[in-house]
């Protein structure tokens, strides 16, 4: 099979990369009714599989789970989760032939095997759903022409999808129809009903494409969402300890610092995050972020180039066939780092202390968010998509680090995201070491003293922060998410 994106001509590539439309709430007036009375079979019962299924059932849909025979016979975790929540569970052969919509929510590396198994069992005119388009775009999976192929991609981990639904809300969601597989023209109706059944329509839905979702998703998770947080954690911890900070305190400042900082980001964008600093600290954070952007821009661009060309995907799929040798090696090495093995700090760190003593971390967040956004937009991805795949998801990933450090982040994210994270962080850490060596007192671990500030300089910096394109689009999109709960647990 050929990478689907690479089979398109340039005009088609640009059209699909640039497909992004914020959908009005009136477009979801019918809710999930298009799928009511139809059989929805979910393949896979992980975080997305279980939680989307719970939401869809609560929205009145007929949901069951198709699992492999051995998973049922051995009563594996997927079988236990589905049965304990009262769902009907059966083998592929028992459930797929009756399904009107088959939703594939297994890990990326399993998609080809799953799709090749279920396709012959699917009835004529059925639909196949994904929550990530990697199998279609990067693997180039060929789907039977009578089958409608759609995507509903919540921009949150599965647990958040469920929690927000239970609160009567939802999470921002991308939906798409594969242009090669919409024989009856019903793909958008199916995708809208599925999104409504998960609650996504209450938080904002973008009509996108499989291509735009995959390319932007890969870029975000490799760079700012996971790679930058991992590289920043390792660099900042080592710097603090090198300068005499208690390793336990240093570990807590970083582990909970990302979450505390990005909670401000979630509520009011980069502007609010920077406003949490004193004026001297804000000016210093801005200067550091500009330096970081200049240093890291080529690395961000390389990741985007490799994602667009398919180089990243081919390398990762080669590792799949080699029993994940690179992935497992990188995972083991990360677990042995000084940050991951540092003792826990039993004392309390006040919320403002995370800002005052984390100026460099704030600069890293600002630089990483803006670089990821700018690089995606420069590659033809629309600003709304770039926002969701950079700034919006960052607090959610930071929250995983607050739970169990980098280990938890890498467990929660997909293997695809984890592989890309390691590629980025392994390149970024040595790239930034000379920069780290030139830091000044107050950049990390100590507060910058109050002092005189040049009014004109402060005015210009404030204007530069507020006028960035991500702040403009973010203000609009956050207007649809004002009811989302705070997630920070730092203390």
Swiss-Prot record:
BP term (GO), one: L-valine biosynthetic process
Catalytic function, reaction form: (2R)-2,3-dihydroxy-3-methylbutanoate + NADP(+) = (2S)-2-acetolactate + NADPH + H(+); (2R,3R)-2,3-dihydroxy-3-methylpentanoate + NADP(+) = (S)-2-ethyl-2-hydroxy-3-oxobutanoate + NADPH + H(+)
Pathway it acts in?
A: Amino-acid biosynthesis; L-isoleucine biosynthesis; L-isoleucine from 2-oxobutanoate: step 2/4; Amino-acid biosynthesis; L-valine biosynthesis; L-valine from pyruvate: step 2/4
Q: Which residues bind Mg(2+) 1?
A: 217, 221
- Could you give one GO CC term from the UniProt record? cytosol
Cofactor binding, note field: Binds 2 magnesium ions per subunit.
What EC numbers are recorded for this enzyme?
A: 1.1.1.86
Domain named KARI N-terminal Rossmann is located at 15-208
Cystine pairings recorded for this chain: none
Query: What residue intervals traverse the membrane?
Result: none
Give binding positions for NADP(+).
45-48, 68, 76, 78, 108-110, 158
The molecular function terms of the Gene Ontology recorded here are:
ketol-acid reductoisomerase activity; magnesium ion binding
Q: Which family does it belong to?
A: Belongs to the ketol-acid reductoisomerase family.
What this chain does, per the entry, is described as: Involved in the biosynthesis of branched-chain amino acids (BCAA). Catalyzes an alkyl-migration followed by a ketol-acid reduction of (S)-2-acetolactate (S2AL) to yield (R)-2,3-dihydroxy-isovalerate. In the isomerase reaction, S2AL is rearranged via a Mg-dependent methyl migration to produce 3-hydroxy-3-methyl-2-ketobutyrate (HMKB). In the reductase reaction, this 2-ketoacid undergoes a metal-dependent reduction by NADPH to yield (R)-2,3-dihydroxy-isovalerate.
Designated name of the protein: Ketol-acid reductoisomerase (NADP(+))
Q: Which organism is it from?
A: Escherichia coli (strain 55989 / EAEC)
